[in-house]
Curated annotation (Swiss-Prot):
Protein name: T-complex protein 1 subunit beta
Record family assignment: Belongs to the TCP-1 chaperonin family.
Binding site for ADP: 44, 98-101, 168-169, 410, 495, 500
Record's catalysed reaction(s): ATP + H2O = ADP + phosphate + H(+)
Species name: Rattus norvegicus (Rat)
Gene (name only): Cct2
Amino acid sequence: MASLSLAPVNIFKAGADEERAETARLSSFIGAIAIGDLVKSTLGPKGMDKILLSSGRDASLMVTNDGATILKNIGVDNPAAKVLVDMSRVQDDEVGDGTTSVTVLAAELLREAESLIAKKIHPQTIIAGWREATKAAREALLSSAVDHGSDEVKFWQDLMNIAGTTLSSKLLTHHKDHFTKLAVEAVLRLKGSGNLEAIHVIKKLGGSLADSYLDEGFLLDKKIGVNQPKRIENAKILIANTGMDTDKIKIFGSRVRVDSTAKVAEIEHAEKEKMKEKVERILKHGINCFINRQLIYNYPEQLFGAAGVMAIEHADFAGVERLALVTGGEIASTFDHPELVKLGSCKLIEEVMIGEDKLIHFSGVALGEACTIVLRGATQQILDEAERSLHDALCVLAQTVKDPRTVYGGGCSEMLMAHAVTMLASRTPGKEAVAMESFAKALRMLPTIIADNAGYDSADLVAQLRAAHSEGRITAGLDMKEGSIGDMAVLGITESFQVKRQVLLSAAEAAEVILRVDNIIKAAPRKRVPDHHPC
């Protein structure tokens, strides 16, 4: 019987696109490697910055070297690149730092996988080798971790070193000591709770970064109303989200026709009485400070002033939420049952000047660990980048307070893990050993890139570092000030164990997900149907 020759059958809708086998894999590798190459120049203490310009009517300018910020603000179309962008975002949310490292490591793993597949090694063999390598690297990292949680002095020094290491690759590196102290003091005030919501960051143009300071209280970037007390002691605070602008008819957009101006005056009087009644209900709570998320119009403001109550309007939602947290109050919208409303409290509310701006200062708040970091700087871009840098440091410190284990930075941990994986590969038979060796090579690329970004001879430095670890000097790492190999324990270049562990596991998982892909199917775009029913 003659064999049937079938033409290829397209099972997808018109407009759908499919990439298969090698084409799909190559497309994934190229996209992921391109993302890694984009951010790798920002890695390390001598990393470079990127300028991000957004288009459109409200075009904004951003100068940053934060991996997560760069990847979040660029639009990517490649599916593998999107996987790495999402991974860096998760790294930022989980531990706050290591966003560039995790992206670069995943990209380097895929670069190695590309050359292994070219040598006809099956993706599943590579994955099996990588899984064993990840396990060995994690165990090596765990065995090198140091825990000073029980020693207060050493733990404080660890926190200072970790904050310093995190900030050394940021814009704040020139004021590292100042901001390290600020960040550590702010996190230690949390008393182990790790609730970063209690740390409020305010940015004010003017002065220099060195003028930034930590304020032991809460600052709200608003002004106190006219003819109202500017200072209140032992404050009882009602925090609300309610309309205080009932000076116009707002009943389902209704219209009112009147036959004389006297009728208009009657309507206005009724509106005023309605507002007066609402203010009286608020005052029944026994408060001396009223903070509203929405506007407070002139008439209710006068009523509050006459009652000797400080009224603060238009406190943005994030400000109100945080204020409720630190003063121990709850946000209210109705005022019929004063006994059910939880009021906030603080010892003193007063108006203060920062630069040319007036702010409201709350001191002696119910949440004792609450504080505000006031950032000063010459331009808005500097302030924004300083805030991002400080956020990374605060997140890492909060993570370290929960899990006090630390490891050494400067490429030391990566080289330690690479050495453990290489030793495992030498004991493993078959093709999996080649995959393990490629994993070790990808880990060694991180110190290589750090040295390259600093303008040093990376091949020579990494060879020296590899030799040092082979000789058993497990605290050896890159000293980027001197351009040589140094002892990280002496130099105080310390990183959080959780950050390093998350970088290793996230990068390995993301690279494995992309390596498993052998088909990319793009759905057909939705057809636009002409609208035959215009408004």
